Amino acid sequence: MRIALGIQYDGAAFCGWQAQPHGKTVQDALERALGEFACVPLHTTVAGRTDTGVHGLGQVVHFDTDLDRTDFSWVRGTNAFLPSTVSVQWAKPMPDTFHARFAAFERTYYYVLYVHPVRSPMLAGRAGWIHTPLDDDAMRAAAAHLIGEHDFSSFRSSECQSKTPVKHLYQIDVRRSGHFIHFRFRANAFLHHMVRNLMGCLVAVGRGRYPADWLADVLAGRDRTLAAPTFMADGLYLAHVGYPAEFAVPPAQLGSVPWSSVWADLDLPS
């Protein structure tokens, strides 16, 4: 039997998603909890591996098991062995054709950026921060150059294991709400550090360091050294993973963050 789980986690508490020998990752915590509840080792496959500091609101995993448990028992039973920084939100039996990674056709990330002369300790690990004003319109104009199917080598980390740098970026939204700017990135898939590298470039344009059309030149150059430095992970959230309707994957529970109303206005895809 194949079981899918919806997972939320505070990325600041972990050294990324992927299991490591030191055991301080989200996958390590989840698989330990599943093993405690199921009394047998269980291996999970994830929709998308996130880096240290990146949060998960709509992460999806699957695993195979012979155990017959109710959906909610997987939720409550696993959560009983998890730390407070990670939680199973839902569980659902799936056909063997479902695969958390390869069945997904799109991913959505949000970035929350606090724009204020003084940093807030209340937002540590929850939002990025910049002390200088940003030009929203300039960032929107720059983002427009990135929409479509392109070779995103200029925004790819040297450690990226993707077979191809070509991805289809469907949408970048920029929305201001008080001292916060909310960015939404939606694509069929993302390269390692791609969103954070895009953020670094958009912020550089927003600060007036480069014109909006500079980003078109960076994209065309296919060279990581042409782009701005990788932006901080603090405000980055994996918010949604899209699957074919036949799998009826439950939606991500975004109401657990204080700025969910702003994200709702951006019309998160179902």
Curated annotation (Swiss-Prot):
Residues that coordinate or bind substrate: 109
Keywords: Isomerase, tRNA processing
Example of a GO biological process term: tRNA pseudouridine synthesis
Superkingdom of this protein's organism: Bacteria
Catalytic reaction equation(s): uridine(38/39/40) in tRNA = pseudouridine(38/39/40) in tRNA
EC main group: isomerase
Entry EC number(s): 5.4.99.12
Active site, renumbered: 51 (nucleophile)
InterPro entries from the UniProt entry: PsdUridine_synth_cat_dom_sf, PsdUridine_synth_TruA, PsdUridine_synth_TruA_a/b_dom, PsdUridine_synth_TruA_C, TruA/RsuA/RluB/E/F_N
Role: Formation of pseudouridine at positions 38, 39 and 40 in the anticodon stem and loop of transfer RNAs.
PANTHER family membership: PSEUDOURIDYLATE SYNTHASE, TRNA PSEUDOURIDINE SYNTHASE-LIKE 1
Family: Belongs to the tRNA pseudouridine synthase TruA family.
Quaternary context: Homodimer.
Name of this protein: tRNA pseudouridine synthase A
Gene name as annotated: truA
